[in-house]
């Protein structure tokens, strides 16, 4: 099931023939009113808008005609398993998809002194970081090299950086020019007496007033139950109205309404322009790989590993290790040699024995301006995870924009390193054949070892062999089970994990959705 707040408002489901008729009327009117290209396929319509006016017109007419709308093309190849895309009784009805990736791809107003930029939602993350690299800046989100992820989609996910200190895209969002479901345009940004953002319509004024009221009504629940300092992929970021030290969002603790739209997966509004705060690209990075007997054993070290402030701390499973061991890229081969993975270990990586946990590993990166400091951090990590290791105790060097350098070998131009794919798959996972990946809601990293051990015991007792992978700094793990075991694993998770939200918070999420999209036409991403 999709997160409940991603679903449209409850309404009588129209028949397919009625929906098709309304879509035909919408397309007929749009052909006269928009400059973008309209494509009809499979009973649906796809609009590639030339500009923001096309989007505003399309949304206004779609609301009038009750045609469901999806925002496509903004998430690249990010799969629905993480994207939280809406799915409902309306999901199969004829609808309109608005795709930003063809024409809304401009970046503007780059401030190289302060590290700020304005972009349209169809700009691809890889293109932006390529543009910024000569200036020493980057947007610190790392996706799969071939994902084609765009900024509109990543903001919709509130994608997390690999380093806890680098935050999520909500933390990088200074403002958002949004288009609401009725075509109203509004800049969402800092709110308060010192803000220069004005509410330019009665709809916007009423909306903002209602949002503050909703947040005030659940302040007590948030103080007791809101997850501290974590991404919220299954709710809206109501904590922007009650900032806390664990995640202040803004330097002075003020309210920035753009942050509420981060992570909403296109269910609240269209992001027309994003105003982003960039990060200085670190001068040097070093990596290391450490084998562990099991995921639960690896995660017992999580608090100590994270206390060293790595710029990436990934938990790998046996399938990930097999990919590294089978790679022809010298980066991956060097990492495997460092961890003692050789040809003789192939049997250990083939999978766990029945009733036993599978092999796991830490893949850890430290980054900084001074290589001596980065090497020192790796030595402390090596002393923690593998005190007997001598060679490579200072990690393998990764230069900005280059590959691992310490082994002195070049890779063929068409061979991509597996470690880079593994890093990006924390945002956009590759699902192995005959496997099911179930993302867990973000957890406190200090509790992960006990949680994984308990779930391993329950799943193994039911004949399911689990493995675990994920981004430990963000407390986000992915449970991997055989494809047919997915329903049983989900049931076990539901019986083990405590409820995420109180009834009052669930109602608040629904109220936020209703304020933005009262007719329920916005179905989110593709």
Cite the ranges covered by each PLM segment:
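N-terminal basic/disordered segments at the start of proteins
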Residues: 16-37
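Glycine-rich N-terminal segment of FAD-binding domains in flavoprotein oxidoreductases
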Residues: 38-111, 118-121, 139-141, 462, ...
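A glycine- and small-aliphatic-rich helix-loop capping segment at beta-alpha/alpha-beta transitions
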Residues: 78-104, 132-137, 157-169, 195, ...
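Intrinsic disorder at enzyme termini
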Residues: 10-12, 16-19, 23, 497, ...
